[in-house]
């Protein structure tokens, strides 16, 4: 009888403990970090719990108005339905303050989309755009980087919110 009780107690304990252990494993497994690195090695983006795959070879998926020769990263997460790209726009022709002022003016003059421009730092400025097209609202969150070269890093989607897009680019680093 004691043996039956101790086996029952052990099974009860196991049953009570298993979900917590399973949850711990699930949380650890689900908190993965994927690091996306541009072809030139200058830009890295660490994204939590993502499934991005390289699509740069698929020219049909290249962002409009970005020359293929400038693209140095193009990744898509089919589960989140978010695409990220990095473009190297060549050597900086002006100082950062002038570049960001000109970029802000150019963005705000485009009346086909809603634009929100963030405050520029020494070498970065973020901005958001959204516009309606035949698929619905197209959201884009970008970070312009002014270094020796000018980089544009953007996340875009017809399905993700601006907040979700900004979260994807939250851990962006630049190697100098």
Question: Locations of the language-model features?
Answer:
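Sec-dependent bacterial lipoprotein signal peptides
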Residues: 1-15
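Intrinsic disorder/low-complexity segments enriched in polar/small residues
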Residues: 3, 21-22, 35, 112-114, ...
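Detector for intrinsically disordered, low-structure N-terminal pre-sequences
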Residues: 3-6, 32, 46, 114-116
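N-terminal regions of proteins, emphasizing targeting and processing segments when present
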Residues: 8-11, 47, 88
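Short, flexible helical or helix-coil boundary motifs
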Residues: 12, 107-110, 176
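N-terminal targeting sequences that direct proteins away from the cytosol to non-cytosolic compartments
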Residues: 17-69, 135, 154-176
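Conserved polar/disulfide-associated segments of primarily extracytoplasmic proteins
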Residues: 58-151
């Amino acid at each position: 009888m004691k043996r039956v009780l101790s086996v029952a107690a052990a099974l009860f304990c196991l049953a009570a403990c298993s979900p917590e252990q399973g949850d711990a494993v699930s949380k650890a497994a689900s908190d993965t970090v994927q690091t996306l690195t541009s072809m030139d090695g200058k830009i890295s983006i660490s994204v939590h719990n993502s499934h991005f795959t390289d699509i740069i070879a698929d020219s049909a998926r290249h962002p409009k108005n970005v020359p293929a020769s400038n693209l140095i990263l193009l990744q898509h997460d089919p589960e989140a339905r978010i695409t990220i790209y990095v473009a190297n726009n060549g050597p900086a022709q002006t100082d950062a303050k002038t570049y960001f002022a000109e970029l802000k003016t150019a963005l705000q003059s485009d009346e086909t989309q809603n634009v929100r421009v963030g405050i520029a730092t020494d070498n970065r400025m973020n901005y958001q755009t959204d516009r309606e097209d035949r698929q619905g609202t197209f959201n884009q969150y970008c970070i312009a980087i002014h270094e020796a070269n000018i980089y544009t890093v953007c996340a875009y989607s017809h399905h993700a919110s601006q907040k979700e897009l900004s979260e994807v680019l939250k851990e962006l680093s630049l190697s100098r």
